[in-house]
Amino acid sequence: MMPLFNVLRSARMLPAVSKKVVSPPMMLRSVRELTNQSKNVYATKEVIIGASQKKKRSWVKWLSVSTLIIGGASYVGYLFTPDWREIVDSKHYYSNWKIRVYLSLPFNTASRVIGGLANQEIPVWLREHLLGGFARMYDCRMDDCVDPDFKNYPSFAAFFNRKLKESTRPISASPLVSPADGTVLHFGKVEDNKIEYVKGHDYDVDKFLGDVDLPQKDELDLYQVVIYLAPGDYHAFHSPARWVANQCRHVPGLLLSVRPTLLSHVPHLFCLNERVVLNGSWRHGFFSMSAVAATNVGDIVVDAEPSLRTNIVRRKTQKIMNTETEIHAPYVSGERVGEFRLGSTIVLVFQAPPTIKFAIKAGDPLRYGQSLVADGV
């Protein structure tokens, strides 16, 4: 074993390890250099990210512009490309550009959504707010109702067809009474087989009612009454006379608004909209009562035809064939016929003697059961 003395001597002969001492100024300079390097790295990243975002924004911008241009061009092409109805009949009402613009809006889809919501049950605590707000907005006369408490109406559909007190709607002894609460849009004699729904705008009887048998008698003329039901009106419709309905015709179509302010801008609107036509007879010959659907009013119920389904999804609605059902439904004045699920229009077309005298004028408010004629029927 090596003596301890030799070990210590060997250790003393080894070269000493040098320890470099860094002065404070050098440390500060190093920190600054590292900081600058970090800043450069972050700056480079920001430049890269900024360029990427700018490129993305530019791509989104050009995509949006391209979509608008292509969509606009397609829409203009749709408006000016002849429709199959125009090809068959160059004078078809669909050739009118205003109708084509209006028809391009998604009224049917919106009406199906609104119809579904109207049938949804409303929580009891919310009924006063929703139904009460609707009643105040559209001036619904709740004092006419059998039940004026909003909490007792589970849905908007139930509220729209609330029962009224019999004392508030006495049925006139007149041979022709109003079928609904509403406003008179137009009335009078049908000239040249055309129904005028607002002044200056008309449509053919056969295009609206379909093929009907109108007995030609010199002592009888054809008349019409058009009644508009506003959203705040009572939405059920009743028999306007003692008559018998022997045919229920469902005509699928669109659900365009029938507000009086729009009727004068869209020709033949009633012929475009979905409708249910009840054809029959009364003591003077032909009698017809039609319920016309509208925006948010696609649901029409006819009590005599429970299988009837309106406001449903169809492919190529305009091309769907009409459905006709033979029925036998005798009615008396004031008897309930059916209901809307909001407001819309009732059109009466009937034969009567030329001595008929109407007791109404355009713009008059009506209540169902109120007399429409003063004499001559």
UniProtKB/Swiss-Prot annotation:
Q: In which pathway does it act?
A: Phospholipid metabolism; phosphatidylethanolamine biosynthesis; phosphatidylethanolamine from CDP-diacylglycerol: step 2/2
Record-listed E.C. numbers: 4.1.1.65
Q: What's an example Gene Ontology biological process for this entry?
A: lipid droplet formation
Q: Which residues form the active site?
A: D181 (charge relay system), H238 (charge relay system), S344 (charge relay system), S344 (schiff-base intermediate with substrate)
Concerning InterPro entries, the annotation shows: PS_Dcarbxylase, PSD-B, PSD_type1_euk
Q: Which reaction does it catalyse?
A: a 1,2-diacyl-sn-glycero-3-phospho-L-serine + H(+) = a 1,2-diacyl-sn-glycero-3-phosphoethanolamine + CO2
Give GO terms: molecular function aspect only: phosphatidylserine decarboxylase activity
Tell me its cofactors: pyruvate
Positions bearing Pyruvic acid (Ser): S344
The residues forming the transit peptide are 1-34
**Note describing how the cofactor binds:** Binds 1 pyruvoyl group covalently per subunit.
At the top level, the lineage of the source is Eukaryota
Q: Which controlled-vocabulary keywords does the entry list?
A: Decarboxylase, Lipid biosynthesis, Lipid metabolism, Lyase, Membrane, Mitochondrion, Mitochondrion inner membrane, Phospholipid biosynthesis, Phospholipid metabolism, Pyruvate, Transit peptide, Transmembrane, Transmembrane helix, Zymogen
Q: What Gene Ontology cellular-component terms does the record carry?
A: lipid droplet; mitochondrial inner membrane; mitochondrion
Q: Which residues lie on this side of the membrane: Mitochondrial matrix?
A: 35-61
Relate the assembly described in the record. Answer: Heterodimer of a large membrane-associated beta subunit and a small pyruvoyl-containing alpha subunit.
Report the family membership. Answer: Belongs to the phosphatidylserine decarboxylase family. PSD-B subfamily. Eukaryotic type I sub-subfamily.
| Known function | Catalyzes the formation of phosphatidylethanolamine (PtdEtn) from phosphatidylserine (PtdSer). Plays a central role in phospholipid metabolism and in the interorganelle trafficking of phosphatidylserine.
Protein name as catalogued: Phosphatidylserine decarboxylase proenzyme, mitochondrial
Species name? Caenorhabditis elegans
Query: What lineage, starting at the top, does this entry show?
Result: Eukaryota, Metazoa, Ecdysozoa, Nematoda, Chromadorea
